[in-house]
């Protein structure tokens, strides 16, 4: 023990996020009182963020295998085969707590961390996406948080040189004290040149690469495993500071060294920094690790072993190197102006030993440190089943046209252009479809292939019925990829929930996970990577359950992708899928009728698969001219989005007599698409869809400058566009009154 270390007291243990029984487990495991640095290491490795101790037993139920899956969960990122010797590497991860405390730096380092996860595997990043959840617009912090987070996401991605091509932005009062910043990165690699974290070989040099270590981010992972309270602002020093230009240099240096025969294993320093990366590399390779902290490059004087082991300074890597390749490897990193230091060696001892100033500061069993964290099967109770809201029991507050104008200009449904125009979404020159559509499409260089990318979840559904909400999040990602012509291949998940020690919250988690598993199985859409973020609560008030789903699909020919914009006048508008007029948990019911209630729409996975496969086939056959899936806001909002994107109106038939008009136009039934076709193809389309028992009905024709529903007031497309595009920039400029989401 270092003479300057504090004594290990119950209060010190508790301040490290360890429960009394967890500390007793440590005492039994190592047979003595831990040193201060060892306590910090256990705190980092055994917290929720790193160990998944509350979620791991439930994550085992997710489907993770398919013939095209090269690497599933357990590595830095998932890897899927897209043919021709190419692989896609991708993952999504949260940076929620830091982004609430320090929105700009929290968001930048969230982007930087997920980019490192991808290029650590040997992939060059080609795209980023994000899912951002903010509090009610009227909350005094919301505008500041939106501005900081969006600037941070854009600032890092733009400077690093990767396009940010899509995502989600939502507002809800349940995120007032805990915003969510979920970042997804996608990269391309050679399928036979994937790099992994497991070390191999005894007495192999362990090399520190990248930027110097400072005191920023200490206990960042532990902070991410606890609730917030009124003193959360005091945790600002635990937020890391990002440097996208250093990360760009690190990327190029790593990819260059990966072209040599130098690398045995590589791991980025993310949560828990040097501790987690060193322990994982050794434990995965059944090896011990000896580190000498005197060799670690630091940017601050007098850093202790505790600080160096727990720092989460950014833009750093740890690599196990072939010993005869040291000079070659060092020359590469020096060329890029980066630190290169041999800080340790692999050993056969199965021990994690850390020295500083000639003293042994840490001597722990490495496998137990990595894999013996407590595993909890926490009590959980199912969410109460909510009654179905029958459409005929909902009195329409507004005429259909007025309701459309109101909805299209709400925080939930308005254009998020103000956000994505701050991102460089075309850098690299491979972005085929930009933000604002169903899914982004990015060209795969050196060939005709494209990737369809999306991020989706509907938290209000997950709150009302976790199982159906989990299913719907996956199904919508699958639909969005399908709507641009992609073949859905795999997902990454980012599971954001409240305090798992509350049975009702754990019940939400379990229910959503079961729904995700059911949908992934039915749609052949495996989970290959992900992240769990728990304790998203402030003063006991939790967020909406938000299991963000990042989906990746493949287009054999990116030039055959579909988009949502109406293309020409006089085309037939078809509604594919069954419409019952489901209003429970709809945006219409909440924002027009002031009722946030009812069961969400059920998800028929067989119908999702059948309808989606048919739509994708029509896209590939060149039968359809525009495609859009129907989600938030229902049929009429989707039609308005198509009209605004194309600058062309539509003449629409009245709602069928069997369904009340507001339910027909604004219900959020699932497994539905709108497509447009040439009149000459109409009969053949109906014939094909009837043969495979896919519901389809013509609902109108494109043309003119208005959305004109029979028997309703017509709405000019430009007027809709104004409301659609105005709300968010007006809000950020302080030009709109906010008293919460309208009529809530």
UniProtKB/Swiss-Prot annotation:
<feature type="binding site">
    <location>
        <position position="116"/>
    </location>
    <ligand>
        <name>substrate</name>
    </ligand>
</feature>
<keyword id="KW-0658">Purine biosynthesis</keyword>
<comment type="similarity">
    <text>Belongs to the FGAMS family.</text>
</comment>
<dbReference type="Pfam" id="PF18072">
    <property type="entry name" value="FGAR-AT_linker"/>
</dbReference>
<keyword id="KW-0547">Nucleotide-binding</keyword>
<feature type="binding site">
    <location>
        <position position="52"/>
    </location>
    <ligand>
        <name>ATP</name>
    </ligand>
</feature>
<comment type="function">
    <text>Part of the phosphoribosylformylglycinamidine synthase complex involved in the purines biosynthetic pathway. Catalyzes the ATP-dependent conversion of formylglycinamide ribonucleotide (FGAR) and glutamine to yield formylglycinamidine ribonucleotide (FGAM) and glutamate. The FGAM synthase complex is composed of three subunits. PurQ produces an ammonia molecule by converting glutamine to glutamate. PurL transfers the ammonia molecule to FGAR to form FGAM in an ATP-dependent manner.</text>
</comment>
<comment type="subunit">
    <text>Monomer. Part of the FGAM synthase complex composed of 1 PurL, 1 PurQ and 2 PurS subunits.</text>
</comment>
<dbReference type="GO" id="GO:0005524">
    <property type="term" value="F:ATP binding"/>
</dbReference>
<keyword id="KW-0436">Ligase</keyword>
<feature type="binding site">
    <location>
        <position position="91"/>
    </location>
    <ligand>
        <name>ATP</name>
    </ligand>
</feature>
<dbReference type="GO" id="GO:0000287">
    <property type="term" value="F:magnesium ion binding"/>
</dbReference>
<feature type="binding site">
    <location>
        <position position="493"/>
    </location>
    <ligand>
        <name>ATP</name>
    </ligand>
</feature>
<feature type="binding site">
    <location>
        <position position="268"/>
    </location>
    <ligand>
        <name>Mg(2+) 2</name>
    </ligand>
</feature>
<feature type="binding site">
    <location>
        <position position="93"/>
    </location>
    <ligand>
        <name>Mg(2+) 1</name>
    </ligand>
</feature>
<feature type="binding site">
    <location>
        <position position="533"/>
    </location>
    <ligand>
        <name>substrate</name>
    </ligand>
</feature>
<dbReference type="InterPro" id="IPR010918">
    <property type="entry name" value="PurM-like_C_dom"/>
</dbReference>
<feature type="binding site">
    <location>
        <position position="531"/>
    </location>
    <ligand>
        <name>Mg(2+) 1</name>
    </ligand>
</feature>
<dbReference type="GO" id="GO:0005737">
    <property type="term" value="C:cytoplasm"/>
</dbReference>
<dbReference type="InterPro" id="IPR036676">
    <property type="entry name" value="PurM-like_C_sf"/>
</dbReference>
<keyword id="KW-0963">Cytoplasm</keyword>
<dbReference type="InterPro" id="IPR041609">
    <property type="entry name" value="PurL_linker"/>
</dbReference>
<dbReference type="GO" id="GO:0006189">
    <property type="term" value="P:'de novo' IMP biosynthetic process"/>
</dbReference>
<feature type="binding site">
    <location>
        <position position="530"/>
    </location>
    <ligand>
        <name>ATP</name>
    </ligand>
</feature>
<feature type="binding site">
    <location>
        <begin position="94"/>
        <end position="97"/>
    </location>
    <ligand>
        <name>substrate</name>
    </ligand>
</feature>
<feature type="binding site">
    <location>
        <position position="117"/>
    </location>
    <ligand>
        <name>Mg(2+) 2</name>
    </ligand>
</feature>
<dbReference type="InterPro" id="IPR016188">
    <property type="entry name" value="PurM-like_N"/>
</dbReference>
<comment type="pathway">
    <text>Purine metabolism; IMP biosynthesis via de novo pathway; 5-amino-1-(5-phospho-D-ribosyl)imidazole from N(2)-formyl-N(1)-(5-phospho-D-ribosyl)glycinamide: step 1/2.</text>
</comment>
<dbReference type="GO" id="GO:0004642">
    <property type="term" value="F:phosphoribosylformylglycinamidine synthase activity"/>
</dbReference>
<protein>
    <recommendedName>
        <fullName>Phosphoribosylformylglycinamidine synthase subunit PurL</fullName>
        <ecNumber>6.3.5.3</ecNumber>
    </recommendedName>
</protein>
<keyword id="KW-0460">Magnesium</keyword>
<dbReference type="InterPro" id="IPR036921">
    <property type="entry name" value="PurM-like_N_sf"/>
</dbReference>
<dbReference type="Pfam" id="PF02769">
    <property type="entry name" value="AIRS_C"/>
</dbReference>
<dbReference type="Pfam" id="PF00586">
    <property type="entry name" value="AIRS"/>
</dbReference>
<feature type="binding site">
    <location>
        <position position="240"/>
    </location>
    <ligand>
        <name>substrate</name>
    </ligand>
</feature>
<feature type="active site" description="Proton acceptor">
    <location>
        <position position="95"/>
    </location>
</feature>
<feature type="active site">
    <location>
        <position position="49"/>
    </location>
</feature>
<keyword id="KW-0479">Metal-binding</keyword>
<feature type="binding site">
    <location>
        <begin position="312"/>
        <end position="314"/>
    </location>
    <ligand>
        <name>substrate</name>
    </ligand>
</feature>
<keyword id="KW-0067">ATP-binding</keyword>
<dbReference type="InterPro" id="IPR010074">
    <property type="entry name" value="PRibForGlyAmidine_synth_PurL"/>
</dbReference>
